[in-house]
Every structure is written in structure tokens, then in C-alpha cells.
């Protein structure tokens, strides 16, 4: 049996752009992607802390160090510039792999610079 587990998480990203007229996706600073082991075209779930929206799309890498978090296409309807979002990727693991899997988690500051890298997510973590 395979289990779907969180593989990477970008916590408290601030939306810098929303481009309704783009074909689709989310553009993410490629330095952030590298830190959480997310890849171009990988499926991600985005949770908007401001309005509760949850959407799925795929990643387009942005300029490294730019701090860009841009929702494109229809996804742009679910955010406003300045909204705080959580971006998560998932992977399929065997039951044995799932027991020891440790996702990569980064917490961003208000300018989308990596503030902290968490080795794991503890229950009742408050940031």
C-alpha cells in the first residue's frame, strides 16, 4: 500500500502578484523551491490564510532571490497581493517509507526570504 505524505511545505509565503491572464500555475522563487525540494511542474496545494481557499496547481520556477509568489490564471481569483499562503507538495511512499519520511519545511518572512528551516513539524506548532 502507498500513502500520500506531505513532502515539502512553504509556510507563510506572501503573495507578490496575481496574474489572471497567464495560462495557469504558481510562480515561486527558485531558491525557495530548492530549499523544500519542489520541482518545476510539480503539483502543489495552496491554502490561503486570509480567505480559507484551497487550490491545486503546478509550479513554475521564478527568479532566485526575488521572493516571487505569483498565482497565475484562474488561481489568481483566489488571492490578493499581500495574502499569506501555505504551499504544500505531496509524495507517494510505501508504508515503511512513510514511517521515517521527513518533509522539508521552510518558514518565510514578510519579504519571502527564508527565515527558518524546520527539521519536522511538531503538533501544536505556533509561528
From Swiss-Prot:
Q: Which GO-annotated molecular functions does the record name?
A: aspartate 1-decarboxylase activity
This protein's source sits in the domain of life called: Bacteria
User: Which residues of this protein are catalytic?
Assistant: 25 (schiff-base intermediate with substrate), 58 (proton donor)
The annotation note on the cofactor reads: Binds 1 pyruvoyl group covalently per subunit.
Q: Which InterPro entries match?
A: Asp_de-COase-like_dom_sf, Asp_decarbox
Gene Ontology annotations of biological process type: alanine biosynthetic process; pantothenate biosynthetic process
Required co-factor(s) are:
pyruvate
UniProt pathway: Cofactor biosynthesis; (R)-pantothenate biosynthesis; beta-alanine from L-aspartate: step 1/1
Enzyme class label: lyase
Tell me, in one coarse class, where this protein mainly resides. Answer: cytoplasm
Might you report a single GO cellular component term? cytosol
What residues bear Pyruvic acid (Ser) in this entry?
25
The family assignment reads:
Belongs to the PanD family.
Protein role:
Catalyzes the pyruvoyl-dependent decarboxylation of aspartate to produce beta-alanine.
By what name is this protein known?
Aspartate 1-decarboxylase
Amino acid at each position: 500500500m502507498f500513502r500520500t505524505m506531505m513532502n515539502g511545505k512553504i509556510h507563510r509565503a506572501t503573495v507578490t502578484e496575481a496574474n489572471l491572464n497567464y495560462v495557469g500555475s504558481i510562480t515561486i522563487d527558485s531558491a525557495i523551491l530548492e530549499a523544500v525540494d519542489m520541482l518545476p511542474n510539480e503539483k502543489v496545494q495552496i491554502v490561503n490564510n486570509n480567505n480559507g481557499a484551497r487550490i491545486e496547481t503546478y509550479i513554475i520556477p521564478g527568479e532566485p532571490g526575488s521572493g516571487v509568489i505569483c498565482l497565475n490564471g484562474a488561481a489568481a481569483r483566489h488571492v490578493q497581493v499581500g495574502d499569506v499562503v501555505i504551499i504544500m507538495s505531496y509524495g507517494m511512499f510505501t508504508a515503511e517509507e512513510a514511517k521515517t519520511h521527513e518533509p522539508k519545511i521552510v518558514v518565510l518572512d514578510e519579504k519571502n526570504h527564508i527565515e527558518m528551516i524546520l527539521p519536522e513539524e511538531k503538533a501544536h506548532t505556533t509561528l
